[in-house]
Amino acid sequence: MRPNAASRLRHGASPTSNALNGNRLGVGFIGSGFNARFHMLGWKGVRDADVLGVWSPDSKRAADAARYANELDVGAAKAYMSIGDMVADPAIDAIWITGPNQARVENVEEIVDALQRGRGTLKGIACEKPLARNVAEAKEVLRLVKSAGLMHGYLEDQVFAPQVEAGRALLWARGAATTGRPYLARAAEEHSGPHTPWFWQGALQGGGVLNDMMCHSVLVVRHLLTKPGNPLATVKPKRITAHIASLKWSRPEYVAKLAKTQAGVDYSKHPSEDFASSTIEFETDDGYTVLGETSTSWSYVGAGLRLSAELLGPEYSMAWNSLDAGLKLFFSREVKGRAGEDLVEKQNAETGLMPVVANEAVAYGYEAEDRHFVRCFLGKETPLLTLDDGLEVVQVLMTAYQSAEEGRTLDFPPPGLDAFRPAVARGTWTPPRQGA
């Protein structure tokens, strides 16, 4: 059983010495919210690394997240007053960027500034999805990280989900090897809406559900269609058709609900899409045209978050639904209790027959992706996904927005993509009227 962080400190193994001897990686988090905490949960299955730092613009939230890491026994984490201070600490070898989209460029600027002024050294940076709010910002993030000469990784958890990885590996090894490559992949992420106000605000987040969640699905379908061991570049996006809508949250009663529960969100004036779909035509290096279908929603009301993926080929198929988790609980109407998310993320009910995702950090891929990038930054593996891949995801998303706005299929990449900003992000999008 591995000694906990406090035990290591009592016996003289400081975070600094652990980090500098090359055997362990000291990791600092930018961001203290929901996403950072999922990573920390996943860290219980990560070897050779400790969560040692947290920075957030809200110092109380940073301290709370650091305390949470200590309670999980994944590192002797502490809160830092600035990103520069965290980078300057010799205990910190790598940064995980998990904060809000609107702060992405600023956060990376602070990291690189500290490095270039000689305040500290890092082995790598891992950045959450989406890489940025638009192509121009994504390119700036990539430029900054490359200017610092750092190894980099793009955090897309669903690519590392065990069901996705196992299904992909088996279908390619058994089905594709004997009857031909797969030709259609589908992926979806659906729930009833985000936790915090900035997600709902197009100007801050960079869009609505397409930007927030289709970033998962467009990479999952491409990953499934790519032969294991081959780079993503062997399956290239060529044409994109997309659609966006506000199906639920522009209805008057739900506009009022958002205004009441999400501070500063007014969908009567500045709505975002709560549903999006796309069809992506890919060309493969072996001469085939293959398809990826994606959909995503903040207007899905079921037991909770539902992730799904499919891969189809000439004589085989796979299907995954995260709510088919095996464990189910039933509570009669006599069972009373507070609302929560103890059964599944974005949980919508506490009675009836409910699925339980017993270890969400594993099921959604957080544990495996964190383990992978730790090993990358320790020189033991090559990154499966880099910020270059994150940039291409943003390019696909912006093309999807442009396709939806123009109502037509677009070649990828369309001209002028670097300067494109979705109407949702500019606050000028008007969805079809919902209700009387």
Describe the predicted segments one by one.
Residues 8-12, 247-269, 277-279, 283-286, ...:
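C-terminal glycine/acidic-rich active-site capping loop/insertion
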Residues 197-304, 388-392:
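Rossmann-like dinucleotide-binding domain that binds NAD(P)(H)
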Residues 2-72:
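N-terminal Rossmann-like dinucleotide-binding module
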Residues 126-197, 215-218:
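A contiguous active-site-proximal alpha/beta segment in oxidoreductase catalytic domains
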Residues 98, 295-296, 310-313:
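Short, well-ordered coil/turn residues at beta-beta hairpins
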Residues 18, 75-146, 163:
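Beta-loop-alpha module in the N-terminal Rossmann-like domain of NAD(P)-dependent dehydrogenases
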Residues 195-202, 348-352:
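The feature captures the short pre-catalytic strand/loop hairpin that immediately precedes
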Residues 16-19, 69-74, 112-124, 173-178, ...:
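Alpha-helix termini
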